[in-house]
Amino acid sequence: MNAPLVGPSGRSPHWVANAVLATIAGIGRSLDVALQAATGGASRRRSADRQLLEEFILPTFSLDRSIKRVLFCGCARYTQAYEGLFPHSEYWTLDPSPRRQRFGSKLHVVDRLEALHRHAVGPLDLIICNGVLGWGINDTEQAEAAIRAAHAALASRGRLLLGWNDVAPRNRVRPEHITALAAFTPAPLSHFGARVRVPGWHRHVFDFYRKA
C-alpha cells in the first residue's frame, strides 16, 4: 500500500489509511450522487484535499449530534451542496462577495469573518474556514481579527477547522503565528491528529481546534 495521505494520532499509518479508504469506499458513491443532485450536476473540485474534506471530514462532523449550528466560510459553486451534508444542523454560510450569495445556504451572511459580531448567528458549534487564509485573509491583522470573531461566536467547546495551503504566497499568515489561536486547543478529529497534511503541489493542511 502507498504511504497514507496524512499523519495519524495514536494509530499505525496502515490502520489509519485503511480506515480512510474504507470510509471513502462506503460513502463516496452516495455522496457523489447526492452532491451532484443538489447542485444540478454542478462541477466539483476533486483534488485530494477536497475529496478528504467532502468524503470524510464533513461527514464525520455531521455525525456529531452535538453540532447543532454550523458556519461555513467562503462560498463557490462546488461548496453549495455542503448544506445537504448537515441535515440535522442549522447551517449558515458567509462570504464577503454579494455575487457569491447564490452559492450560499438559505441562512447566509454577506460579510467578512472579522465582522461576524455584527450578525446574530451564534452561538455556533462548528466554524469551517477552509481556503480562506491566504485567499482573502491575507495579513496578520486580518487573521487575528477573524480568529477573535470566530472565538466569540463559538459556543463553549465549539470546534474550528482551518484549511490552508502551506505554499507561498498562500502561507504568508501561518496558524502558528496567529496569537488569537491561543484561546483554542488542538482537537484531533476521529482517527486523525489535530493537524492533517495532504500531499500535493499546494501542500494543503487541515488544522482542527476546540474553543478552550
What are these regions (language model features)?
Residues 128:
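A conserved beta-strand element that flanks and buttresses the S-adenosyl-L-methionine
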Residues 156-165:
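Conserved beta-strand signature within the Rossmann-like core of class I S-adenosyl-L-methionine
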Residues 60-62, 114-122:
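Short amphipathic alpha-helix with an adjacent loop that forms part of the alpha/beta core around
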Residues 171-212:
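Class I S-adenosyl-L-methionine
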Residues 4-65:
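Class I SAM-dependent methyltransferase Rossmann-like catalytic core
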Residues 131-132:
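Short catalytic micro-motifs in class I SAM-dependent methyltransferases
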Residues 69-116:
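Class I SAM-dependent methyltransferase SAM/SAH-binding core
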Residues 142-156:
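A short glycine-rich, Lys/Arg-flanked "PGG" loop and its adjoining helix->strand segment in the class I
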